[in-house]
Amino acid sequence: MLILSRKENESIIIGEGIEIKVVQTGKGYAKIGIEAPKSLMILRKELVQQVKDENLHSVVQNDIKLDDLSKKLIK
């Protein structure tokens, strides 16, 4: 992992067409702005993780329901 120090209004460039700018800093947080092509999806990591967790939970629940159903069909 590359770690860089940036002050407010300073930026980094990633590849072609992606700029990440520190907009504001405060105690324990930093607000960043991202300029990127509209074709590039930008998501917060915690939202991606939340969707993964919900999908996993849904699969586990469906497995349990299928197991119950198969037991009823065997009887």
Swiss-Prot record:
Homodimer; the beta-strands of each monomer intercalate to form a hydrophobic core while the alpha-helices form wings that extend away from the core. Binds to FliW. Belongs to the CsrA/RsmA family. The gene is csrA. PANTHER family: CARBON STORAGE REGULATOR. It holds the Pfam family CsrA. Induction: Constitutively expressed (at protein level). HAMAP family: CsrA. A translational regulator that binds mRNA to regulate translation initiation and/or mRNA stability. Usually binds in the 5'-UTR at or near the Shine-Dalgarno sequence preventing ribosome-binding, thus repressing translation. Binds mRNA; 77% of enriched bound RNA is for flagellin A (flaA) while another 13% encodes other flagellar or motility-related genes. Binds mRNA in 5'-UTR or intergenic regions, binds consensus 5'-AAGGA-3' in the loop of a predicted stem-loop structure. GO terms for biological process: bacterial-type flagellum organization; mRNA catabolic process; negative regulation of translational initiation; regulation of bacterial-type flagellum assembly; regulation of carbohydrate metabolic process. Disruption phenotype: No visible growth phenotype, increased expression of the flagellin A (flaA) the major flagellar filament component. Flagella appear normal, the average swimming distance decreases about 20%. Expression of other flagellar genes is not visibly affected unless flaA is also mutated, when an increase in their expression is then seen. mRNA for flaA remain localized to the cell pole. A double csrA-fliW deletion expresses the same amount of flagellin A as the csrA deletion, has 2 wild-type length flagella, a wild-type swimming distance and restored cell pole localization of flaA mRNA. It comes from Campylobacter jejuni subsp. jejuni serotype O:2 (strain ATCC 700819 / NCTC 11168). It is found in: Cytoplasm. This is Translational regulator CsrA. One of its GO terms (molecular function) is mRNA 5'-UTR binding. The keyword Cytoplasm applies. GO terms for cellular component: cytosol. Keywords: Bacterial flagellum biogenesis, Cytoplasm, Repressor, RNA-binding, Translation regulation. InterPro entries: CsrA (IPR003751), CsrA_sf (IPR036107).
